[in-house]
């Protein structure tokens, strides 16, 4: 679609690399991060394979992308890395949040960055915010789009929404 193409062009211009991660995620990876237990993160859709292996449908990709980067970044010279994807997310939402209806399945574009230093991280973050402003300008929403804070239990202080 045209909007996704504009986003893709601006993310690439900012140094992003597009990838696609699996929607089926291993229990072990999320247990290691202490985010598999429903008492900690209660939005998982979980299933079992015939061999009893437990999997979850992706509600986020922090753990899988971190595992991938650990395997492929071999030197600080490889940094910064900005990886993004357009991915179907699945969240077992129980109610609307912040006045906006939350759905159980949606397509989201997310970007993950890996930097050498906090200063470099902040530079990357600023460049991506500028890229989003450019996206909104290009699609004709620049005058009516305002940055907001992506507040929530699983998001870090360096998350933003528009």
Walk through the language-model features, giving the residues of each.
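TRNA-recognition modules of translation machinery and tRNA-sensing kinases, especially anticodon-binding
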Residues: 1-162
């Amino acid at each position: 679609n045209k909007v996704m193409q504009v986003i893709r062009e601006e993310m690439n211009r900012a140094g992003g690399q597009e990838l696609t991660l699996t929607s089926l995620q291993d229990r072990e990876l999320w247990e290691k991060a202490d985010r598999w237990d429903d008492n900690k993160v209660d939005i998982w859709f979980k299933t079992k394979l015939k061999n009893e292996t437990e999997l979850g449908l992706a509600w986020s990709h922090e753990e899988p992308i971190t595992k991938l980067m650990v395997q492929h970044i071999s030197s600080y010279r490889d940094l910064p890395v900005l990886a993004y994807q357009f991915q179907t997310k699945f969240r077992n939402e129980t109610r609307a949040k912040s006045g906006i209806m939350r759905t159980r399945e949606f397509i989201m574009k997310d970007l993950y960055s890996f930097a050498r230093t906090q200063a470099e991280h902040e530079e990357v973050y600023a460049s991506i915010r500028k890229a989003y402003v450019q996206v909104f300008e290009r699609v004709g929403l620049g005058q009516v789009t305002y940055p907001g804070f992506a507040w929530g239990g699983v998001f870090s202080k360096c998350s933003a929404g528009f």
